[in-house]
Amino acid sequence: MISYLASIFLLATVSAVPSGRVEVVFPSVETSRSGVKTVKFTALDQDVELKLRSAGEILGKRFAIQDVDVESLRRKIYRDSVNGAALLIDEDGPLTIEGIVNSKLRIQPFESGRITKDGIIAHQIVEVIDDKKSYDRVAVIPENVKRNAENVSRMARDDDCIVVEYYIVTDSAFTKRFKSNSALTNYVTVMFTGVQNLMDTLELGIGVRLLGVTTFTEKTEPSFIKDNLIPGPPAAFDPDVLISAMSKYYCNHQTGLAKDTDLIFLITARGMGDPREDGTVDINTAGIANSAGVCKPCFKSGIATDDSDYNERVDTLAHESVHLLGSPHDGEGPNLVSLEGSPGAANCPAKAGYIMGNRNDKNKYKFSPCTKKCVEYLLSKPTASCIFQQCTDF
């Protein structure tokens, strides 16, 4: 049986609760000859102008999910990495826009859908605020696994591209929030388009790809979910137990997308935290992942909670992804990285406020120089070979 050392860190996270500030707008969209879309509107004291480029590559070439028109979805994905925008723009009928405008604003078609101005339907802008803190955890892989992980198939070539492929599974609580697979896939696509924006701040040329999504229901949830749910109330998980069980499950079920992918993420709408003696759970954990687990069949798992409608956990998914890519929290040394020789992040204090630290307004949507060095170190090792692909392959 594999045992883990869990590193726990206080992580400021956005809880996507409306601040009370909501405004109806009629956004304009212009498309240049190069395909760049300019979206403009004024809302909540902000003049917003986004320069959006197609981001259809977020969906892998063979991405598929039941009842979803993948090629149609691919054409609708746009992002502005400078402003952190991740949007689905549908111009097949009346213009609709949904997704992340920036760190504080979200956009979606107005509920009635009947209000129009100059042929443009009304959209709702919602402001989200940071209203709580929660813990993040990282499971440190034992020493014997660290040493054995270097035995992989091939080294990267100089002309390869760095592409991190994700397989997403959702628990029944997350799945039933959505009316259809299409609505869930739209949400997850926006989420990982936002993750790509944050990965860009590493300036390492890392691409994000979704290979597929499996939406579990109460009837189809695998044992690692069912057997480890604490009834509560509310029903919740012990994150350390769940990540261990998930890792073991996929270690023993290396087939299909679970075998092909670089990372497997569970998205749950249930909470995670520390069990109390009375059978309830202190909900305090946003996410957990295995340290430097990328490309390791038995350790490439991560978990993120998401219990709202406004895609507030993009930062959590990026944070957990970077744990899997070899970075500890800012302020932590190499002893908390499951990769021999890692530089660690002790030279970057948590109070500097980056994504892997305690996050302040200046730096909370960027990674620290130490995080970049840790990820660069992992990329230099043969253990990371699975995320290097020939640039013509995607």
From Swiss-Prot:
Contains 4 disulfide bonds. Residues 17-157 form a propeptide. Keywords: Disulfide bond, Hydrolase, Metal-binding, Metalloprotease, Protease, Secreted, Signal, Toxin, Zinc. It is found in: Secreted. Pfam families: Reprolysin_5. Zn(2+) binds at H319, H323, H329. Its cofactor is Zn(2+). Acts as a metalloprotease. Penetrates intact tissue and specifically cleaves the vesicle-associated membrane protein 2 (VAMP2) (part of the SNARE complex) involved in pancreatic secretion, thus disrupting the normal vesicular traffic. Belongs to the venom metalloproteinase (M12B) family. This is Venom metalloproteinase antarease TserMP_A. It comes from Tityus serrulatus (Brazilian scorpion).
